Amino acid sequence: MSNVSTASGTHFAPPQADRSVTEEVDRVNSRPDELENQEVLRQLPENGNLTSSLQREKRRTPNGKEAERKHALPKSFVDRNLSDVSPNHSLDHIMHSNEHDPRRGSDEENMHRLYNNLHSSNNNVHSKRNSKREEERAPQRRSSSVAYTQQQFNGWKKEFGHAFKKISAIGRLKSSVNSPTPAGSGHRHNQHQHQQVNEEDLYTQRLASDLLDSLLAGCPASLFASTQFLRDEHGKRRAPLLLAKLDVRVSPLKNDNNILDITNSNHNHRGNNNNNTGENSDRRPSIPRSSSIISISSNVAEFMYSRNENSLFRIHLEYGIDEDRLKWSIIRSYKDIKSLHHKLKIVAFQQLTISKLYSDNNRYHSLQLPHFPHYKEMVKERNVMEKKAENKPSSAASAPHTSENNNNDNGSNITSLETLSSSEISEFNIDNVKMKHLQDLIDEPDDFSQPIHLRLERYLRLLNIALCLRPHANRLFEFYELSPLGNLLSRESGFQGKQGYLVIRSTAKAQGWRVSHFGKHAFKDMIDRHTTKWFLVRNSYLTYVSDLSSTTPLDVFLIDWKFKVRFSGNKNNILDNENEINWIIHDPNLEINDELEEFGIENDANNILDKNGKSKTHQKKSNISSKLLLLTLENSERKLKIICKSESSLKQWMSSIIKMSTSTPWSKPNRFGSFAPVRTNSFCKFLVDGRDYFWSLSEALLMAKDVIYIHDWWLSPELYLRRPVKGNQGFRIDRMLKSCAEKGIKIFIVIYRNVGNIVGTDSLWTKHSMLNLHPNIHIIRSPNQWLQNTYFWAHHEKFVVIDETFAFIGGTDLCYGRYDTFEHVLRDDAESLLDQNFPGKDYSNARIADFHDLDKPFESMYDRKVIPRMPWHDVQMMTLGEPARDLARHFVQRWNYLLRAKRPSRLTPLLTPPSDLTAEELKSLPMFEILREKSTCETQILRSAGNWSLGLKETECSIQNAYLKLIEQSEHFIYIENQFFITSTVWNGTCVLNKIGDALVDRIVKANQEKKPWKAFILIPLMPGFDSPVDTAEASSLRLIMQFQYQSISRGEHSTFSKLKKLNIDPAQYIQFFSLRKWSTFAPNERLITEQLYVHAKILIADDRRCIIGSANINERSQLGNRDSEVAILIRDTDLIKTKMNGDDYYAGKFPWELRQRLMREHLGCDVDLVEFVEKKFERFEKFAAKNYEKLHTLSKEGDSGNNWSDREMIDSAMIELGYREIFGCKFSPQWKSGHGNSVDDGSTQCGINEKEVGREDENVYEKFFNSVDYGKSSRKRTPLPKHNFASLGLTFNHRAGIENVGIRDHKVLSTDPRLRKNDEHKKEVDGYGPDCWKKESNKKFKADATEQLKEWALNSLASKVLDDKEMIKSEIPEGFSNYLPNEKDLEMYLTDKTVTNRNKWSMLKRICYLQYLSHKLDERKTQRLKKIKDMRRHLSSSTESTRNGSNSLPLNEKSNEGESTNVDQDIEGDEYHRLHEDILKNQELDDGSLDDLLSQIIPKITNFNSGEIDDAKKEELLKLNFIDPYSFEDPLISSFSEGLWFTIALRNTLLYKLVFHCQPDNAVQNWKEYGEFTELEQEFQINQEKLIDLEAENINSTTTNVVDKDREKEKMRKAAELRMKLSGSLLYGFNQKVFDKHTAQRILERIHGHLVIFPTEWLAKEVESRNWIFNSDRLSPMEIYN
C-alpha cells in the first residue's frame, strides 16, 4: 500500500499482522542508505551525460533532497562527469529550463551564462553546500518527525499510535520493495509508459493513488467525514471538498499590456469537454517541477530584483482525479498570496492564545503553516552570499544555511506577525509527509535560488496538505475560487467564470422577490439578504448561495438579450464609452479580448484612439474611478446590485461577467423577438391526436434518468397513457412518475391554479396527489390570483421536457378528455372498467357538462348509453437536443419566477438553466446515430410572456410575430387549425389588437392584385367547448366567444370578409373556414347520434415549408403576450421533397408536407394508420431494391437505344417488382421469370415481402426512436446503438434537488388537502389495489399486452388481406370498392405499359395495397355490424318479453369483444334485415335511387371556378363520390383538390348532417324562431328512433313467438301508421323540415366521408343585427376574458 496523507502530513497504510512483514520493516528502517545506494547504482547510465541523469534522479530518489547525495555517488565520480559535460547537450538542457523563465534573456546571454557556469567552480560549491546542508538536516528531521507524530496522535485516538507507526513503516516498505523504482525512474518499462502518459496525467495518477490509500486506511476516511462538523473562526461549516484532490501549478505573468493576449483567466471546465479555444483551454501549460541551479544561478539577482509585490501569477488548478476533472485558472498577485498567509497566521495566533487560556491544551490544535517565500528573504540571502564571496573568494562553497526551519529567522523583520517565534507557531514539516504526488517537493528543498513562482507553488501545495482536514481550508477555497456548488455545476459546458463573496445592495422588490415586511421574521430576513453571499458566474447566468460551503442557490440571475452590466463611478452609470472600457481592461488582473468588439473598441493597449481617431498613450491612472464599488446587473426581468470588496475586485467581476455575456448565445437578440436562438439540425416528429402523444410520452418516461419538467394547464394524476386499461395499469401517469421518482429522478410540475369552481380542473387535488407520491416530486400552482392581482389570465403552456434532452410541445394537456384516436369514436359502453378506452372521467363531453368530482376518477359523469363523448382533435410534436434545452430554460425561468412570487410553504429548490449542448454531448445522446439523418429541421422556440407571467418588463409576443411573418411571406397557401379565431376586429367598444386577421387580408389583397392563386384553409370548432345551450342565460361565455369570432370572420365592418368585400374581392375564392363533426350508432339499440369533433390543435402550415406548433390560440389572450402565457415552436425542414404546387413542380419541406397530408387525410376519412403502414412497407421495399437491384430488376440486357440501363432505372424496376410480388402474393412476376428463370436466386427469397424477414429498423417511428436503445437486454443485431450511453452526459445540478439543493420556503403553515389527509384508500388505489386491479394482474401478461398495444393500433385487422392467393382478385370484395380495385389483367397491363412512368406505377401499387387492406377492414366491420344486429334482435326480444311479464329491468347487452371471432347467421343480411322494419315503414324508407334524387334537389348549384358556368359533372361527382384516394393530397392548391375534393366533401357532409340530424350551428338558422324549429326537429328525430325501436322489438317478438294477439297487433299497426304519418307529413315543409326514419337516415349518413364540414358563418345573423343575440347579463363580464 502506498503512503497516504492526513491533515498533519503523516502517512499511514493498512496494518499488517504478518510477523515477517514487521521484521522486514525493521530491516529496512535500520539500513535505508544501503538500499538506496544499491537502487541508485542500478539506475546509473552506462555512458552519456550525467547532467540529465542527475536531473531525473532528483525526482526518482524517494527519501533524499538532491541527486548529489553523498551516499549515492562518490565526489570524484561527480566531478569527473561534470567535467565531461557536452556543451551542446547542456545548452539544450539549459535553454529548455530557461524557456519557462519569464525573465530569460536572449540566446547570446544564455550562451554567455552557460560558458561561465561550465567553467566556474560553482558546480562543486553547490554540490558541497547541499551535501553539507543534508548532513545537518538529517538528525534534525528525525527528531522533528518524532515530535510531530507524537503531537498529532495525542490529538487523535492515542490507542492507535503504535498501529499507525507500523502502517507508516509498511508504507515505506511497499514503496521500496514493491516499487523499487519510484515514479519517474529510468526503467525501460517505466520509460516506455512515461512516453505514453504525459506528466500531467502521471501526476494525477499519483494524486489518485494517495487519495485512495488514505481512504482505505480507515482513520483518514473517517476524518474526512468528520470535517463536516468543523466550523471556522466565523462559525461557518467547512466546505465539503477534499484538498487532497487539488493540484496547484503557478506560472508567472508579465505586468504589462501583453496580459490582454492571455485568455481564460477565470475559466474552468471539465476535462476535454471544454468547447472554448485558447492556449490554456484544454491543457495546463507545462511548468518545470524544478529548475537546475546551473541554469539560473547567474541570473538570480536579475530575477529577484525585478520582481515586487505587485507581480502577477497565473495559478492553474485541477480538482479531481478522473478524466473529467475540473480545471481552471486564476490570476493572483504576490500581495494576494502574502495576504492569505498573514491571515492564516493571525488565525493560528488567535487559536494559540485561546488554547493557553484553557487547561485543556487540546482545545485547539496548533495550526502549522509552511514557510512563505518572501522577496526580502531572497534579497538578504543574496547579499549574504555576495559578501561571503568577496571575503572568502576561495571558499565560495560555504553557502548560508537555507533550511526551512530557519527561514523564519531570515525574514523575522518583515512584519510584526513574523516576530512570533517558531516555538509558539510551529511550522509545517514536509519531512513527515510521504506522498507520491509530493515526491518532487520532498526531493528538492526550498532554495532561494529558485524562481519565485516555483517557491510559491511549493508553498501552496504544502498549504493544501497543512489545511487538508481543518476548517481554515475555507480561506484557501475562497482564494482558489473553489466551492462545492462550483464543483457540482462543473459538469456544465460553456464559459465558467469567477467566484467569490459579494454583498447585495438592491432591495428584494428590485430583485423580483415578494417578501413580507411585517412578519416576525421580516427584520432578520432583511439582514440576511444584505449579508455577504458567495456568487458564481456560470455559462449563461449568475447564482449565489449563503456562504462558500452551501450548495442551495438563493437566486439565479439569467442572461438574456436585454442584459446590461453597469458600474459606479461614471456619470451615466453605464458601460458605454472608451474610457470606461480602458479603466477595466488596463487592470493587469483582467483579460478581455474579443469581448471588446461588442463595445466597438479594438484591443490595442499600446495604441488607444481618442474620440477624434488620433493615437494616444495609455495613462497608468484612468480618469474614472469607482468609489462605491457597485455593480448593477439588469436583464429583461429585474435588477441586481452587488458591492465588491475593492476596485481590483470590481474590475475582475466586470471582466468575468462581460466575457460570460459575450460568449453565450442567450445575450444576442433573436428572430421575431424571441428569447431563444434558431437551432439547426434538429429532429422533429409530429404526434397527431392523444393516442400517439401519450404513447410516445410513456416511452420517453421509461427512458428518463435525470430530471422531468412538466408544464400543463391541467394535469390529471389518474390519466392512463395507454389504452385500454387492461394490461396498461402501470402506464397511469401518477404511477409512472412515482416509479421515476423512486429511481432518484427529480420531477418538477407547473400547473394552472384554478379559482373555485369557475374552471373545473381541481388543481388542489392534482397538487397534493402528486406531492404525496414521493419527495422527489415538486409542484407549483400558478398564478396566485390574490397575491399577483391576476384574475383572468392563465399559464397555458403544454410541454414536457425529459432529461433536458427530449421535449414534447403542442396543444395537448395531460388530463381527462384529451386521449383520442384518428377515428374519434363517440361511444365506449363497455361494462368493465378494464375494457374501456375512456375510463371514468376520461369519458367527457364539455358541451353537456363540465368536469366535476375529480377526486372520484373512476366514476363516469354521464350515462354512457345515452350521452356520447365529444371527440378531441389535437396536435403535439416531439423534438430532441437543443430545442429541448431551450424549453428547459423557459421552464427554469418560469419556475424560479413563481418561487420568487409565491414563496411556497414547502422546501422547493431553485433551478439552474441547462447549458448548451456541445457536439460531443449531442453525439452521446441515445438515438443520435439513428436519427442523425432525420435531424434536418431548423427550429426556434417562441413564446407569449409578460410581466404577470414571467416578470418581464417588456412583453414578448414572438408567437404573434412569427404568425404574421409566415402569413406575409407565404407564396401559395396557409393551413390553420386552432381552437379560436378572434383577431383584428372591434365589437361593443372592445378592440381586438392582434394583427393576424389584418395579415390575412393583406396577403389576399396581394394575391388578388398579382392574379396568383393563394388560399387559406382554416379549421376551428363548430362551437366553443362550454356547456349549456346557446339560448340559455348560463351560456354567457359561449355567446360572447362566438360573437367575437363572427365579428372577426364575417360580421361587422371590421370583419375579414367585410374588408375584402369593400375591395370587391370574393372571400370564398381565397379563404374558407371549416369544422369537424362525427356521427355514430349508440348501443344498445344502434340509435343514431352526432357530436362535433372539437378542434383543439394550434398549428399553422405555410407553403408546406414552414409550420408553427404550440399552445397559442388565435385570440387576444394568447397572442398579445401580456395575458395567457404560451409557448410554440417554429419548424422549417431543410430536407426537401419534390412534389406539386398548383400543378407545377415544387420542393416542399418534408415535416410540414407530411403533417398537412396527415391532417387532411384524417379529416376526409382516410385510414391514416393503414397509410402509414403501407408507407413503411414500401419504404422498406425501396431500401431493399436499392441494395439488390441487379438481381431484382426486370429490364432487358440493353436499353431501347442499345445502351446499358442506368442504376436509377434498374432500382425503379426492382421496386416495381417487389411491389408486384406484394400485391399479387407471388414469388416473382412473369417479367422477372422471363429474364431470370426459375432457378436464378434473386437474393430476396421473399425478403422485403415477408415482413418477418425484413430488417425492420424503420418499421415504426416510435419503436425506432424509443426502443432501439440497448439497456443490456436488447439485441444489437438490427439497430446500431449510440457509441456513448445516455448516462455519459452525467446528471445535472437540478437532479440534486432536495439533497444538495435543499430549497427555500416561507415561514407559513404547510398547505394540505383534507380529501387526501389520512386517505388510505387513495394510497392503496395508487399502489394498484383499486378498481383497475393492477396488482391483481399477471405481470407477465401485463407486459406482453402493453408491449404489443402499439402494433395493434396500426396492424389491427391487417393480419390477412382480401387478396392472399392466386384467385384473390376474383374473391368477394365489399360493394363500393368494385369500381376501384382492378382485375388482375388490367393491373398487369398497367404495370407492363412502357408509356406509364415508373413513378406512376409505384404510386399505383401503393394505392392498390391500401385498398386491399381497407376492403378487408371494412368487411370485418360489416361482420361485426351484423353480429350487433343479431345481438340487438336478441335484446329487443328479451326486453319485450320482460315488459310483457311486468318487469322493468333490462338484461345486459351481450356484446362480445371486437377481437373475438363470431358466427353470424348470414340470413340476416340484405332482404331479411330489411324485413324487420319494412312492415312498419312501408314506403317511407327510401332506397338508394330515391336518395340520389333527393340529394340532387337539395345540393346547391356548383359553379366552375374557371368558366363561371354550372358544372353538372362536378355535381354528379359530388353525389356518387364514395372513395378518397389517400395519395391525392400532394398538391393542396390545384382546383381538382381544393375545390373538387376538399370543399366538395365538406359541403356534402354538411348537407347530409343537416338533412338527418338538423344539427346546429347551421347557416339555415337565422333567428331564434328557426333555432327552436331545428331543435324540435332534432328532438323529433330522436323520438321517432325510439318509437321505431319499440315497434321493431314487438315485431321481432311476434315473429319469434308465433303468438297471435289481435289487440296487440292492432296497437302495433296504429303506432306504425302514426309514425308513417309523421315521417310523410314532415316533407310538406320542405327538405329542411324532413324527419327521416332511422334506417333511411343511416343510409344517408353512410355517404359521409370523414369529419370535415363547412363552418357556418351566418348562424343567427339576423338576431345579431337586431341586437337580440347578446343577453343583458352578458355585458356585465369583462370582455378581456373572452377575446
UniProtKB/Swiss-Prot annotation:
Residues 291-487 form the PX domain. GO terms for molecular function: phosphatidylinositol-3-phosphate binding; phospholipase D activity. Residues 791-818, 1091-1118 form the PLD phosphodiesterase domain. Residues 116-125, 263-279, 405-416 have a biased composition (Low complexity). The active site is at 796, 798, 803, 1096, 1098, 1103. Residues 1-150, 173-198, 259-289, 384-416, 1430-1465 are annotated as: Disordered. It comes from the Eukaryota. Pfam families: PLDc (PF00614). CDD domains: PH_PLD, PLDc_vPLD1_2_yPLD_like_1, PLDc_vPLD1_2_yPLD_like_2. The modification Phosphothreonine is found at residue 1462. Residues 20-34, 63-82, 90-112 have a biased composition (Basic and acidic residues). It catalyses: a 1,2-diacyl-sn-glycero-3-phosphocholine + H2O = a 1,2-diacyl-sn-glycero-3-phosphate + choline + H(+). The modification N-acetylserine is found at residue 2. Keywords: Acetylation, Hydrolase, Lipid degradation, Lipid metabolism, Meiosis, Phosphoprotein, Repeat, Sporulation. Signal peptide: none annotated. GO terms for cellular component: endosome; nucleus; prospore membrane. Its EC number is 3.1.4.4. GO terms for biological process: ascospore-type prospore assembly; cell morphogenesis involved in conjugation with cellular fusion; intracellular signal transduction; phosphatidic acid biosynthetic process; phospholipid catabolic process; phospholipid metabolic process. Activity is dependent of phosphatidylinositol 4,5-bisphosphate and the regulator SRF1. Inhibited by magnesium. It is an enzyme of class 3 (hydrolase). Belongs to the phospholipase D family. Required for meiosis and spore formation. Seems to be involved in the coordinate induction of late meiotic events. PLD activity is induced under sporulation conditions and seems to be necessary to complete the meiotic cycle, but not for vegetative cell growth. Present with 49 molecules/cell in log phase SD medium. This is Phospholipase D1.
